[in-house]
Amino acid sequence: MPSRLRXTRKLRGHVSHGHGRIGKHRKHPGGRGNAGGMHHHRINFDKYHXGYFG
């Protein structure tokens, strides 16, 4: 019964594997640990550690 695969076969090994690029299921959305502190996590840092980034 390989016919079940047809729809998704081409998506194997692709970043957005049948889920689209938004709301993708990644292991570490936002990077690991403090990654992006300077960039996309800056809001939180400013809120709690004001002036941490200069």
From Swiss-Prot:
The modification (3S)-3-hydroxyhistidine is found at residue 39. The keyword Ribonucleoprotein applies. It is found in: Cytoplasm. The modification N6-acetyllysine is found at residue 47. Hydroxylated on His-39 by MINA. Residues 1-30 have a biased composition (Basic residues). Residues 1-42 are annotated as: Disordered. The keyword Cytoplasm applies. Its main location: cytoplasm. One of its GO terms (cellular component) is ribosome. Keywords: Acetylation, Cytoplasm, Hydroxylation, Ribonucleoprotein, Ribosomal protein. Component of the large ribosomal subunit. The ribosome is a large ribonucleoprotein complex responsible for the synthesis of proteins in the cell. Belongs to the universal ribosomal protein uL15 family. Component of the large ribosomal subunit. This is Large ribosomal subunit protein uL15. It comes from Sus scrofa. The gene is RPL27A.
